[in-house]
Amino acid sequence: MAHPSQLGLQDAASPVMEELLHFHDHALMIVFLISTLVLYIIVAMVSTKLTDKYTIDSQEIEIVWTVLPAVILI
């Protein structure tokens, strides 16, 4: 039974729902790992001192293009 403050999904009542719960957990882990990797790359690019100004001309707009869709989806 679901509760108002419950963060996860309800308990499965059928085998199909059980598989959907496993798929949800697996997909959520993949999304988390990809988001962590993208965040690490952005932080590494912003904080490094060894950048060429011609290589990273529009770094700020690229960060916005990367982060904004993630924020909208969350």
Curated annotation (Swiss-Prot):
UniProt similarity note: Belongs to the cytochrome c oxidase subunit 2 family.
All ranges on the Mitochondrial intermembrane side of the membrane: 1-14
Co-factor binding comment: Binds a dinuclear copper A center per subunit.
Topological type in the membrane: Multi-pass membrane protein
Database matches in Pfam families: COX2_TM
Purpose of the protein: Component of the cytochrome c oxidase, the last enzyme in the mitochondrial electron transport chain which drives oxidative phosphorylation. The respiratory chain contains 3 multisubunit complexes succinate dehydrogenase (complex II, CII), ubiquinol-cytochrome c oxidoreductase (cytochrome b-c1 complex, complex III, CIII) and cytochrome c oxidase (complex IV, CIV), that cooperate to transfer electrons derived from NADH and succinate to molecular oxygen, creating an electrochemical gradient over the inner membrane that drives transmembrane transport and the ATP synthase.
PANTHER family from the UniProt entry: CYTOCHROME C OXIDASE SUBUNIT 2, CYTOCHROME C OXIDASE, SUBUNIT II
GO BP, sorted A to Z: ATP synthesis coupled electron transport
Subunit (UniProt): Component of the cytochrome c oxidase (complex IV, CIV), a multisubunit enzyme composed of 14 subunits. The complex is composed of a catalytic core of 3 subunits MT-CO1, MT-CO2 and MT-CO3, encoded in the mitochondrial DNA, and 11 supernumerary subunits COX4I, COX5A, COX5B, COX6A, COX6B, COX6C, COX7A, COX7B, COX7C, COX8 and NDUFA4, which are encoded in the nuclear genome.
Cofactor: Cu cation
Cellular component terms (Gene Ontology): mitochondrial inner membrane; respiratory chain complex IV
Keyword Transmembrane: yes
Membrane side Mitochondrial matrix: residue ranges: 46-74
Catalytic activity reported: 4 Fe(II)-[cytochrome c] + O2 + 8 H(+)(in) = 4 Fe(III)-[cytochrome c] + 2 H2O + 4 H(+)(out)
One GO molecular-function entry: cytochrome-c oxidase activity
Subcellular location: Mitochondrion inner membrane
Main location: mitochondrion
Protein name: Cytochrome c oxidase subunit 2
Segments passing through the bilayer: 15-45
Gene: mt-co2
